[in-house]
């Protein structure tokens, strides 16, 4: 599908709006496709070709809070994709990888659970998740709190969720830093005092040429009087592995010693266990004020690596040490909603998010190759170290603490002049410790047995902001919205590291210089937004937006060589993404068809990129590198063709391009003008179909999902590519209870509330490249989970 473009879909004389959009986006190669789709929408809005007997089967309406107030998604003049509770359940969405598979606007770069990074609209800085790297370009929220973290986002289990909202494009006004390319919001279910509700889900799946998946999920909603309710959900999941750690050897250059990994050989060794719960207490006061207290806890422990070694063959690798990933996080949140007057309502939220990761990783190939680039040869004369086993592994401990508080007020009216005004305060700390261990290193040289190098770093970021938006009606059909966020960010970095247990210079080895450093960086700015929305009629909304998103500034950690060179920056500046967007939303054919689309051009100025220079700095650093432009087209279509058949098609076309030559700090051309941003496919689409029917008086369904991701580059140098790929899932489900029968007619009466589903995930057993890492002298890639066939029992009381 290279160079895939929709052809213009209209030939009639252009109207003034079309001419205006043509002029604004004349340099965007997708503009004609977009205007063609818009013309179809306008044409449909004046026709009704469907039978009256089918008029009640309209596309589901979804209420979202992306604009900080509850709004029908079709009335919201911004690009938002919402995945409802019904769709989450029907498609068995359990983690962020599943969410990304349903949105063509999201690009996922994965190296395994807890180590996934994602981008919206192709805003990829090419980073690799280093803890010393730049902040994320996409914000990730659980309810009212951002939980994005440097070096890999948390992956909460998706169960008992009300909806997922994907806000596309910069959201700097209402959502602040890291909402640069967009925002993903996980909205959990609230307690409901109106009645008792409970259920459970049991699942088992068999992985092709792998192990098995098993899960148990449950929830209960308990009214505690007329105004109070408690909602609890919990899960216990074991996901089997499919990657084999195969026998291998490595020989070291200086000593000629050869070691093998026989102690670590294992089939299907990349398994993961997950468990957690969420407790939420809600109380509605007689005054109309609601109080909501929530606590979430999640723990996952994974064994092995999701990365495979290309030289070993498909779904195989060779590791010379144990690799584990233990990820625990909790979120405690208090939310109060109420009215200050008949015309003004308020929301107060304060949340604490804590996360701890313990991580081990095999670094044997790093010793074998990259150290020769980083240090003098004598540093690896293993005879000098009296070492015949130079394998290495590192142990990392990360502790994230994030506290955020927001208070906002807004007018209660849904039309006329309306406004929102708020303040946001956040403090986050990342304390991470990494130890590089060489078990056979000579104890003569190290004060701590087996230790080669250790670092202890504390990274603190704080943000204070005032934000607001105001909407004025210019006419009965046209609204103008102006928004602004004034913010101040502060970053502090305390770093210390040293070789062989010494945080200062080594007493014997002159090259082994330790260090203790402190860095600080402050930054303040304003992020604006302008939006104009026009209701062409009751079915079609047109809008145009200018918005900005940003990532905060920060500091780097430098060693002595880097400081003395004077070319590695001690700090880096904030980067800004400006967005020009024109879109439409249409609900057509008596609600049976929804067609939405937008055309956008985004300019990314002085964007932050994380990189290495091995002969100067053995750790990652961030620099502002240059300018890129990302142009794109997004289309969403939903069809309820009949009462029993529905379909959807979503499309994203992206043109991510460097607008100037990029040079590295040593003056070498690293990225020529015109190259594409790393990891960004130029085309993606997602197609779904669902058919409901009756089998022997029992309700049944079959659904099919298909996604396509185009080719992308592994780096901004545009040399190696990730091939395009498709993934498909198939589901068949039935309600064991007879349609219209009494309990006595069923084998067991309780089956009236049960459903049974057989599913086939990754139908074609595809193994696409989802992530790539080549920093070890070999290439490590993350692929897709193999074909999995399973059975799921769902019961609702």
Name each model-derived stretch.
Residues 30-31, 221, 400-409, 414, ...:
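Conserved C-terminal beta-signal and adjacent last beta-strands/turns
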Residues 375-378, 384-411, 447, 459, ...:
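Outer membrane beta-barrel strand-and-loop segments of large Gram-negative receptors
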Residues 217, 335-363, 535, 541-551, ...:
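Membrane-embedded beta-barrel scaffold of Gram-negative outer-membrane proteins
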């Amino acid at each position: 599908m290279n160079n895939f473009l929709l052809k213009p879909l209209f030939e009639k004389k252009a109207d003034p709006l079309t001419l205006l959009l043509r002029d604004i986006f004349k340099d965007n190669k997708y503009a004609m496709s977009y205007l063609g789709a818009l013309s179809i929408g306008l044409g449909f809005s004046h026709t009704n070709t469907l039978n009256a007997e089918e008029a009640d089967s309209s596309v589901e309406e979804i209420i979202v809070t992306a604009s900080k107030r509850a709004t029908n998604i079709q009335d919201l003049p911004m690009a938002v994709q919402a995945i409802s509770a019904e769709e989450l359940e029907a498609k068995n969405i359990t983690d962020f990888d599943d969410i990304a598979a349903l949105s063509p606007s999201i690009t996922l770069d994965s190296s395994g659970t807890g180590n996934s990074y994602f981008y919206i609209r192709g805003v990829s800085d090419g980073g690799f998740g280093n803890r010393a790297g730049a902040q994320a370009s996409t914000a990730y929220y659980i309810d009212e709190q951002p939980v994005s973290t440097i070096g890999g986002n948390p992956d909460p289990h998706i169960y008992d969720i009300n909806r997922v909202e994907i806000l596309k494009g910069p959201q700097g006004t209402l959502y602040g830093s890291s909402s640069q390319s967009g925002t993903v919001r996980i909205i959990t279910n609230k307690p409901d005092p109106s009645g008792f509700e409970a259920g459970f889900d049991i699942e088992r799946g068999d992985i092709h040429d792998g192990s098995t998946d098993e899960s148990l999920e449950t929830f209960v909603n308990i009214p505690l009087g007329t105004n109070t309710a408690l909602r609890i959900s919990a899960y216990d999941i074991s996901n089997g592995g499919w990657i084999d750690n195969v026998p291998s050897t490595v020989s070291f250059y200086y000593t000629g010693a050869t070691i093998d990994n026989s102690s670590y050989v294992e089939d299907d060794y990349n398994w993961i266990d997950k468990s957690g719960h969420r407790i939420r207490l809600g109380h509605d006061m007689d005054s109309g004020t609601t109080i909501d207290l929530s606590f979430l806890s999640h723990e996952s422990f994974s064994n092995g690596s999701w990365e495979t070694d290309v030289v070993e063959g498909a779904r195989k690798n060779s590791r010379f040490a144990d690799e584990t990933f233990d990820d625990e996080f909790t979120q405690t949140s208090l939310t109060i909603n109420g009215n200050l007057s008949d015309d003004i309502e308020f929301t107060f939220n304060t949340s604490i998010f804590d996360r701890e990761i313990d991580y081990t990783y095999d670094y044997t190939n790093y010793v074998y190759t990259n150290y020769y680039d980083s240090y003098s040869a004598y540093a690896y004369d293993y005879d000098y170290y009296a070492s015949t086993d130079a394998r290495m592994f590192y142990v990392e401990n990360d502790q994230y603490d994030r506290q955020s508080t927001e208070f906002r007020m807004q007018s209660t009216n849904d039309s006329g002049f309306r406004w929102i005004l708020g303040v946001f305060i956040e403090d986050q700390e990342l304390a991470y410790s990494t130890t590089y261990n060489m078990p056979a290193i000579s104890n003569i040289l190290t004060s701590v047995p087996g230790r080669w190098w250790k670092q202890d770093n504390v990274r603190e970021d704080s943000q204070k902001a005032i934000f607001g938006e105001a909407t004025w009606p210019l006419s009965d059909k046209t609204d103008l919205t102006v928004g602004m966020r004034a913010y101040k960010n502060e970053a502090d970095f305390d770093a210390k590291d040293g070789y062989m247990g010494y945080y200062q210079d080594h007493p014997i080895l002159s090259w082994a210089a330790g260090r203790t450093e402190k860095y600080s960086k402050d930054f303040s700015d304003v992020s604006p937004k302008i939006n104009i929305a026009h209701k062409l009629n009751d079915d079609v909304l047109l809008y145009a937006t200018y918005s900005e998103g940003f990532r905060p500034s920060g500091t780097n950690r430098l060693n002595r060589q880097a400081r003395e060179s004077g070319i590695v920056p001690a700090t880096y500046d904030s980067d800004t993404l400006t967005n020009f967007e024109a879109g439409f939303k249409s609900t057509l054919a008596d609600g049976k068809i929804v067609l939405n689309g937008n055309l956008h051009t985004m300019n990314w100025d002085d964007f932050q990129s994380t990189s290495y220079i091995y002969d100067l700095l053995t750790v990652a650093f961030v620099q502002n590198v240059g300018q890129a432009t990302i142009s794109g087209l997004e289309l969403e279509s939903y069809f309820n063709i009949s009462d029993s058949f529905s379909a959807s098609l979503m499309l994203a076309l992206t043109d991510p391009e460097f607008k100037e030559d990029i040079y590295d700090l040593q003056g070498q051309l690293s990225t020529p003008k015109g190259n594409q941003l790393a990891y960004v496919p130029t085309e993606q689409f997602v197609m779904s179909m669902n058919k409901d029917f009756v089998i022997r008086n029992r309700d049944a369904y079959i659904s099919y999902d298909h996604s396509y991701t185009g080719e992308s580059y592994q780096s901004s140098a545009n040399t190696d590519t990730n091939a395009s790929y498709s993934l498909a899932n198939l589901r068949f489900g039935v309600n064991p209870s007879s349609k219209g029968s009494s309990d006595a007619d069923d084998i067991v009466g309780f089956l009236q509330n049960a459903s049974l589903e057989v599913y086939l995930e990754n139908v074609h057993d595809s193994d696409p490249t989802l992530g790539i890492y080549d920093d070890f002298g070999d290439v490590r890639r993350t692929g897709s989970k193999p074909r999995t066939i399973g059975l799921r029992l769902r019961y609702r009381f």
